[in-house]
Amino acid sequence: MVLLLGRFVAAAHTGHCRMCKIWDIVFGGILIMAAFTQIVEQASDILWNYLLLFLLVGTGIFFTIKLHFVQLSSFADGVRHLFKGFSLHGKAADKDGMSSFQALATAIAAQVGTGNITGCATALVSGGPGALFWTWVSAFFGMATIYAEAVLAQTYRTTVDGQVTGGPAYYIRAAFKGKFGKFLAIFFSVALILALGFMGNMVQSNSIGDAFHNAFGVNRVVVGVVIAVLAAFIFLGGVKRIAAVTEKLVPIMALFYIIGCVIILVMNASAIPNAFVQIFTLAFQPQAIAGGVAGVTVQQAMRYGVARGLFSNEAGLGSTPHAHALAKVKQPQDQGALAIIGVFVDTFVILTLTALVLITSGLIPEGMTGTALTQAAFSLTFGSFGKVFIAICMLFFAFSTILGWYFFGQVNFNALFGSKYTKVYSLIVVLFILIGSSLKVDLVWALADFFNGLMAVPNLLALLALSGVVAGIARNKKD
């Protein structure tokens, strides 16, 4: 009996030690992951706060001056081209490109994402209502930057394997000749594929999974499977199917969300004047608003407002030129004018409406942020339907972004490896969408932000190097 007891204790001790080793490995992995996430977040903060915010805004100011406030002089042209080309059933995209409206819709599909809902709420909590003013400022100058991007994308587009294509990877090579230009183009393509095609789409899938789980109690894995299947079906149809979906989805989702916001603002009409007072006052004198967001400085309002504007409309990041390159237009300036409208719709319409709903709700100082704050603000007017409304909008916004980002990644994947491997890229993206719906994606968010910043650097350098080309084309505009 003593012998058997001794063997049992020894076995238990051995098993316990093995369990300890397994636990040590798991716990060590968690600590390493947390530490790595923190390192990436700190690197991303340094990249964005000390380089990109100044470079992006500075580039916008530079092009605004060089192009003589093109965002104002070409705005009417953009509106005219928008209504001239608007159609929910336009001619199908083909090897020669797509219609100007389809290109704009694909660009806006990427621009108008979950950041217009959750990101706006986070910016207002962190930077106060005054952050919206600085979002407007960054978007105003960003219009000039995105005009330059679209013009260059049109100018340096090319044909690969019988399909018209273009984007920063192509005009970067034109800006910087030789090995350096090739290196920057490859660097940009790799950063974009990682930031948008893979990790970015993982985050978008996660946003949809969270929204539907919170609103309806649906299992996140089920949501991921449905989104992945829908995405795969559209991906397999190529640019033709993506353009056909975005030209219908973007106007419908924008109108649906705008109507919801307008209803709330009509109900809260008496609070709108004070909301604008807060926006303009808190942008310069945060301490002047009693009972407002405590401890928010002018610097914080500026930082979070500018960052949200740049993240939202993507002007200067080098993403939307891939769509604008495919537009069938008479001259590059026409698509440049339409690109300006994309920033206007994203920031001055949709994001601004979200901000006004949040500010007039009076909930910003209540300690909530992100999706929770937005859902609470909409629920004040819509009741329990508020969560459902936001979940539906998150589905529209995030799924449209998945389509846009997939396409941008595909262009760069094909530039690196050739179109014969497109299905491999599609499969990888679908897997990331499926996995992302149910995972905690803090590290993925951090990596996506970091690579987003990295891809912007060569794009902005190329824009500045080719500024003379942009100015020359802008001067030669024909009515």
Language model feature labels by segment:
Residues 141-149, 225-239, 250-270, 303, ...:
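Selective recognition of specific alpha-helical transmembrane segments in multi-pass small-molecule
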Residues 88-126, 152-155, 160-175, 190-193, ...:
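Alpha-helical membrane segments and immediately flanking helix-loop junctions
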Residues 147-161, 262-278, 286-293, 326-329, ...:
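Extracellular/periplasmic helix-exit of transmembrane alpha-helices
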Residues 10, 55-59, 70-79, 188, ...:
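Membrane-interface loop-to-helix entry segments
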Residues 25-109, 114, 125-130, 142, ...:
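N-terminal alpha-helical transmembrane segments of multi-pass membrane transport
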Residues 82-104, 139, 150, 154-195, ...:
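Transmembrane-helix boundary/entry motifs in multi-pass membrane transporters
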Residues 63-64, 138-162, 173-206, 210-234, ...:
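Helix-loop-helix module between adjacent transmembrane segments
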Residues 35-36, 66-71, 115-120, 196-208, ...:
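Transmembrane helix-loop junctions in multi-pass membrane proteins
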